[in-house]
């Protein structure tokens, strides 16, 4: 810690085990440093409230919720926000777990801080392991994983169906999917179906957003998660200079709470 303090960093990135994130973030905030913490910001409601209080007192804290910056998800979110679907009513997401999925659901449905009713259940699923963080798996091992399904019913009328098994992060046998529907159309993965200005149905493929940093990251061989984190860190420069939050802390805390 003393070596880090002596360097006078512009930013302290807290990437520790989940149980320690809130405490370590608080420690560095108390020292007067800006902090970018891993997700989730905290595991307990009291810790979430304490972090919010520090924020209100002027502490500079951001939480690295990165999924909305995934190039594939960013273009889908942009299509929804363009108004092409009308008002987004339903989101069916099978792309991430827990707080990441909640973040995406709230963004796709433009739900903000609306009250929400959450229901769900889980099942045990058997599947042959084919991939991992460290590379392909070829031993044919049959493993048990947990499939979780949750429904989020927002007070404003939007509903999200979350369906995810952790194996989907690294598997050749399970894919991920995104579907968002409004009265004028639907985004299903990278396909947009909607009505044009004349009321005629159109169908087109979504293309990546013009983001030079994301393009450079992809060209350098970074995967989507690495690209999203790089984009988040780049945007932190503006926040540290007094600009807007990269991802509102209120949203990051709400994601973790739900």
Please describe what each predicted stretch is:
Residues 15, 150-157, 180-183:
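Active-site beta-strand termini and strand-to-loop segments that position acidic
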Residues 9-13, 17-18, 22-68:
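Beta-strand-loop-alpha-helix segment that lines the small-molecule cofactor/substrate pocket
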């Amino acid at each position: 810690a003393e070596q880090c303090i002596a360097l006078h960093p512009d930013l302290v990135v807290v990437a520790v085990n989940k149980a320690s994130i809130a405490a370590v973030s608080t420690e560095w905030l108390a020292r007067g440093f800006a902090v970018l913490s891993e997700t989730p910001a905290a595991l307990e409601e009291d810790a979430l409230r304490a972090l919010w209080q520090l924020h209100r007192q002027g502490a500079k804290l951001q939480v690295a919720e990165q999924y909305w910056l995934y190039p594939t998800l960013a273009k889908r979110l942009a299509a929804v926000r363009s108004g092409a679907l009308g008002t987004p009513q339903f989101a069916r997401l099978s792309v991430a777990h827990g707080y990441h999925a909640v973040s995406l659901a709230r963004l796709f449905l433009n739900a903000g801080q609306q009250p929400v009713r959450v229901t769900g259940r889980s099942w045990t699923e058997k599947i042959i392991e084919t991939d991992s963080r460290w590379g392909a798996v070829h031993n044919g091992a049959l493993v048990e994983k947990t499939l979780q399904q949750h429904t989020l019913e927002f007070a404003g009328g939007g509903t999200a169906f979350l369906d995810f098994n952790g194996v989907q992060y690294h598997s050749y046998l399970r894919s991920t999917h995104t579907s968002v529907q409004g009265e004028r159309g639907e985004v299903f993965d990278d396909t947009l179906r909607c009505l044009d200005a004349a009321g005629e149905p159109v169908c087109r493929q979504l293309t990546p957003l013009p983001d030079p940093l994301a393009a450079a990251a992809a060209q350098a061989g970074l995967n989507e998660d690495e690209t999203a984190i790089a984009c988040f860190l780049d945007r932190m420069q503006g926040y540290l200079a007094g600009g807007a939050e990269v991802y509102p802390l209120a949203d990051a805390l709400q994601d973790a709470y739900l």
